[in-house]
């Protein structure tokens, strides 16, 4: 959310860090996440699409009031992406990557294929983006419960459902400021084992951001308007910093002679 991920990035190397912290009502569970991402927009194209690469190493902490506190490394992401400039301020991107298996209490116990389809409109200072994220786990049931344990009597196993997430962004820039609405939804796509209850949620919120020149800062707040089998509604505060580490120099304009023979 908050990024025009359908549009190709200008050639360069970028650091993006998204952090969020929230609490789920009813079960009094708090979750904190930080997602540092290194993105490289290359000078190459394939079929007219800009070739881009992304690496992410998320960290997660989970706390249940007066019960447990867990923290560790989430599944790292390795991905490649093609992003097309469709003209008239429209862009489309396709990402293919994988979240790698990680032996951690706060990670899925399986490698998953990750595909993302994004469409963005960026005309007249708008960012209108829809981003669909489709995850397919290679191992739906494992011998490590980790982030997602199976229901009894299989509590010592891990259940890793396939999933679909959809992120929506509708923001507009006003000078160096940006403001607008964001939303996301997620749902499990399959039942890994008998007795597993598929989870889903929908959340909406607002975003504000500011371009400080070398860095862009964003903040947004979301809250669930629908949830199923999560045990409560989630409210989360998000923050993001976008920092260009290097950008390709632009070619100087070709001078037009004032006099021709």
Regions found by a protein language model. Name each.
Residues 1-43, 50, 56-68, 101, ...:
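Transmembrane beta-barrel domains of bacterial outer-membrane proteins
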Residues 13-15, 49-55, 92-96, 128-132, ...:
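Transmembrane beta-strands of outer-membrane beta-barrel proteins
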Residues 27-33, 69-75, 106-112, 157-163, ...:
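Transmembrane beta-barrel outer-membrane domains
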Residues 20, 143, 147-261:
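Outer membrane beta-barrel transmembrane domains
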Residues 4-12, 26-28, 42-52, 66, ...:
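Short loop/turn motifs that connect adjacent beta-strands in outer-membrane beta-barrel proteins
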Residues 94-98, 110-113:
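Loop-centered beta-sheet repeat module
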Residues 20-26, 58-66, 83-87, 97-106, ...:
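Sequence/structural signature of outer-membrane beta-barrel proteins
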Residues 3-5, 17, 36-42, 78-84, ...:
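Residues on the lipid-exposed face of transmembrane beta-strands in outer-membrane beta-barrel proteins
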């Amino acid at each position: 959310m908050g990024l025009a991920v359908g549009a190709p990035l200008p050639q360069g190397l970028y650091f993006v860090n998204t952090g969020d912290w929230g609490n789920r009502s009813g079960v009094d569970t708090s979750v904190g996440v930080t997602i540092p991402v290194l993105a490289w927009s290359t000078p190459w194209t394939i079929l007219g699409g800009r070739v881009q690469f992304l690496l992410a190493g998320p960290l997660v902490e989970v706390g249940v009031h007066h019960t447990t506190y867990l923290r560790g490394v989430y599944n790292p992401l390795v991905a490649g992406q093609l992003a097309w400039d469709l003209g008239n301020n429209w862009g489309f991107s396709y990402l293919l990557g994988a979240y790698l298996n990680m032996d951690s209490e706060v990670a899925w116990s399986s490698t998953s294929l990750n595909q993302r389809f994004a469409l963005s409109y960026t005309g007249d200072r708008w960012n209108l983006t829809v981003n669909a994220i489709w995850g397919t786990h290679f191992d739906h049931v494992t011998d490590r419960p980790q982030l997602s344990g199976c229901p009894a009597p299989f509590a010592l196993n891990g259940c890793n459902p396939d999933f679909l997430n959809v992120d929506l962004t509708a923001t507009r820039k006003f000078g160096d400021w940006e403001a607008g609405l964001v939303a996301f939804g997620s749902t499990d796509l399959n039942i890994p084992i008998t007795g597993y209850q598929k989870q889903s949620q929908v959340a909406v919120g607002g975003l504000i951001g500011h371009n400080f020149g070398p860095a862009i800062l964003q903040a947004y707040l979301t809250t669930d308007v629908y949830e199923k089998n999560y045990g409560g509604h989630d409210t989360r505060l998000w923050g993001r910093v976008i920092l260009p580490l290097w950008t390709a120099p632009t070619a100087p304009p070709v001078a037009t002679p004032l006099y021709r023979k």
